[in-house]
Regions:
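Residues lining hydrophobic/aromatic ligand-binding pockets adjacent to catalytic sites
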Residues: 3-6, 10-197
Length: 197
C-alpha cells in the first residue's frame, strides 16, 4: 500500500540520519558473500573484533586472507580484537567460566576500543565491526558493544544480508523476548553463551 511504503521510506531516511556503526558476522559465508554484504552498505572500514582472528573451519576468514580480500575491494581492514574481543585475556572478566559483560565493559582496554569506534564515527567513516557469529543475538556485538555504543549516542546496525539489516533495538527485543534491557531487576545482565575457563 502507498501509506505503508511512505512510512517505510520515512523510517529508512530517519535511520540513515542517526549516528551509527555497522556490525556483521561471517558465520559460514563465503568471502564474496561477505564482501557483497559490506558493499551493499558502502562500508569503508572493516574492524575485526574477534579475539582470535582465524577460523578453523572457514580459513578464508583467517586474518591475513580476510585483510587481503576486503582490501582488494577497497575496504580497509583493521584489527581490534585485543580491545573489543569477546574472549578477553583478562581473567577477571569471567564469572563461573563465562565472560561477564558487566565486568568487561568497565575495563580500560574495552573503553579504549569504544573510544576508537566513536572517533571513527565522529569523522564520518562508514565502519563495520566483524565477529564470527552470523546471528547478532548470539554475539557480544549486540549484547555488549551495541549496548555500550547506544549509551554514547551511536546505534549499532547489524548487517544480516545484502541490503538487509536489523537495528540494535530489534536484536535486543528478540534477545530479551520483548522485555528490553530493563527488567524488574534493573539492567539486563548479559554473559557469553558458553563457558571458556
Amino acid at each position: 500500500c502507498y501509506f505503508c511504503n511512505s512510512i517505510e521510506s520515512i523510517q529508512k531516511e530517519y535511520m540513515e540520519q542517526l549516528s551509527h556503526i555497522f556490525s556483521i558476522g561471517h558465520g559460514s559465508k563465503d568471502i564474496k558473500e561477505l564482501i557483497l554484504e559490506l558493499q551493499s552498505f558502502d562500508i569503508e572500514f572493516l574492524v575485526d573484533i574477534r579475539s582470535k582472528p582465524y577460523s578453523k573451519f572457514y580459513t578464508h576468514f583467517n586474518q591475513g586472507f580476510l585483510k587481503y580480500s576486503v582490501e582488494e575491494y577497497h575496504i580497509k581492514y583493521g584489527y581490534m580484537g585485543d580491545l573489543l574481543g569477546g574472549l578477553p585475556l583478562d581473567r577477571t572478566c569471567y564469572t563461573d567460566g563465562k565472560v561477564d559483560y558487566n565486568k568487561l565493559k568497565n575495563r580500560e582496554f574495552f573503553i579504549e576500543g569504544l573510544k576508537r569506534l566513536q572517533n571513527a564515527n565522529s569523522k564520518g567513516f562508514n565502519v563495520c565491526i566483524l565477529c564470527s557469529e552470523s546471528n547478532p543475538k548470539e554475539c557480544h556485538r549486540a549484547k555488549l558493544i551495541g549496548v555500550e555504543l547506544q549509551k554514547m549516542g551511536i546505534e549499532l546496525r547489524h548487517i544480516i544480508g545484502i541490503e538487509k539489516e536489523k537495528t540494535q533495538n530489534q536484536v535486543i527485543f528478540e534477545l530479551t523476548n520483548g522485555d528490553g534491557l530493563n527488567t524488574i531487576f534493573g539492567e539486563e545482565h548479559f554473559t557469553s553463551r558458553k563457558k571458556y575457563i
